[in-house]
Design a protein with these regions (language model features):
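ATP-dependent adenylation/nucleotidyltransferase module used to activate substrates
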Residues: 2-179, 188, 192, 201-214, ...
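ATP/NTP-dependent adenylation/nucleotidyl-transfer catalytic domains that generate, transfer
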Residues: 1-27, 33-36, 42-50, 178-301
């Protein structure tokens, strides 16, 4: 295998691109894909400071690394979910990454915000763990960005993540979710920051390769609550399709974004309010996070 760029020995083959790259030119390719995502969707500028949500995994730390290398001002946000040793190790990876580069890392503890760590929340509410976790993450990312003055939050969602989410939404025809399936969500209220996904053009394999080549130390273990998650099953289905027809995930996601998503965008305006309990944005009187926190308090007290 020869590198498409220089003709030297390739270290990585990308079947969906019908190309192979040596290590230096793969890193160049990776950074160009991120730059294209940022440019195409006007995600942020060099005048802004970006809050990068990091989990200690390969995707979010790879994203933080790319943004640093490209000269963006950044700060990290780690959400401590309180998931046993997994959270301790993942937090340590984020702290080590930030310390080695002299970067700011903000830490928010879910237990302080919702009243209990995620394992206890799951037991108390009997709702799917990923549901309570996702709700808490979205709320705390937005709140932390507002409190610290960051206009945009960047997450490490990759092509595989986005294709699997879209697959689940289409399979169940969750038409409310489809308009929000986007690499960049604008601020629609003074108390909502922008949310962007600069890695959406890159696969999980590609982010893993970048992290390895850049020597990024990340947590390899999956979240213990991920076992049996529907999203994992969706990824496995798409993996089989990708193996049979390279580029399927890309075509599925990008076809939706380019041609189908506009048809699902809501015509009516959603009226936003400030939660009467916490002041964050909601469509009702009390936000879903405050309802969750209240339920946890009642069932654990």
């Amino acid at each position: 295998m020869k590198c498409r760029k220089c003709g030297g020995t390739a270290s990585l083959e990308l079947r969906r691109h019908n190309a192979a790259f040596c290590s230096p030119h793969f890193i160049e390719f990776f950074r160009k894909q991120v730059a294209e995502a940022v440019h195409r969707h006007h995600m942020f500028t060099t005048d802004e400071t970006i809050m990068v949500a990091v989990s200690g995994g390969k995707d979010s730390l790879a994203l933080w690394d790319v943004l640093i290398e490209d000269g963006y001002r950044t700060a990290g946000l780690y959400l401590d979910l309180g998931i046993f040793d997994y959270s301790k190790e993942s937090r340590a990876k984020c702290e080590a990454f930030a310390a080695a580069r002299g970067l700011t890392l903000h830490v928010e503890r879910v237990a302080e915000a919702v009243g209990a760590p995620i394992p206890v929340v799951q037991q108390a509410t009997r709702r799917p763990t990923c549901s309570a976790c996702g709700l808490s993450k979205r709320y705390l990312m937005n709140r932390a960005a507002l409190e610290h003055g960051y206009p945009v939050v960047a997450t490490g969602h990759n092509l595989d993540d986005e294709a699997a989410t879209l697959f689940g939404s289409v399979m169940h025809w969750q038409t409310d979710a489809l308009p929000r399936q986007s690499p960049a969500l604008a601020s629609t209220h003074p108390k909502l920051v922008r949310r962007v996904k600069p890695l959406y053009r890159l696969s999980e394999l590609e982010t893993a390769a970048y992290a390895f080549l850049r020597g990024i130390d990340y947590i390899v273990e999956e979240c213990p609550f991920a076992k049996g998650a529907t999203s994992i099953a969706h990824k496995q289905v798409l993996d089989r399709l990708e193996e049979a027809s390279p580029g399927s995930k890309h075509n599925f996601l990008f076809g939706f974004l380019d041609r189908a998503r506009p048809a699902f965008e809501r015509v009516e305006n959603v009226e936003l309010h400030e939660c009467t309990s916490c002041g964050q944005v909601t469509t009702g009187a009390v936000c879903a996070f405050c309802k969750l926190a209240d339920l946890v308090k009642r069932r654990t007290s």
